[in-house]
Amino acid sequence: MSLTEARFHDLVDATQQTLEDIFDESDLDIDLESSAGVLTVKFDNGSQVIFSRQEPLRQLWLAARSGGFHFDYDEESERWMCDKSEEQLGEMLERIVLEQADIKLEFEGL
């Protein structure tokens, strides 16, 4: 069953808030910018990751140095899953943040 527009926005809003909380609570030198449904995370080494919502596709997109990734929400596991690798958003973020910014963070629940 496809996500309704309202449910999709609620899920993305909640996910972006969780991400902001994780980065804020890390006490690391990270800049967060949120505007028009796009969350940009800037690390002190100048690299960044960008999260954006793709409403027509009901997907959450992640842009990083290693590429662009598209996530569909899986109602059964209640997780965002990469549409290519089937990797959970949280697992991929742990790997990307470590590779890109040499920071070890846990994204539990994502």
Swiss-Prot record:
Protein name (database record): Iron-sulfur cluster assembly protein CyaY
Family classification: Belongs to the frataxin family.
Classification via PANTHER family: FRATAXIN, FRATAXIN, MITOCHONDRIAL
Function: Involved in iron-sulfur (Fe-S) cluster assembly. May act as a regulator of Fe-S biogenesis.
Annotated coiled-coil segments of the chain: none
Protein keywords: Iron, Metal-binding
Any GO BP annotation: iron-sulfur cluster assembly
Gene field: cyaY
Record-level GO cellular component terms: cytosol
Originating organism: Pseudomonas fluorescens (strain ATCC BAA-477 / NRRL B-23932 / Pf-5)
Pfam families: Frataxin_Cyay
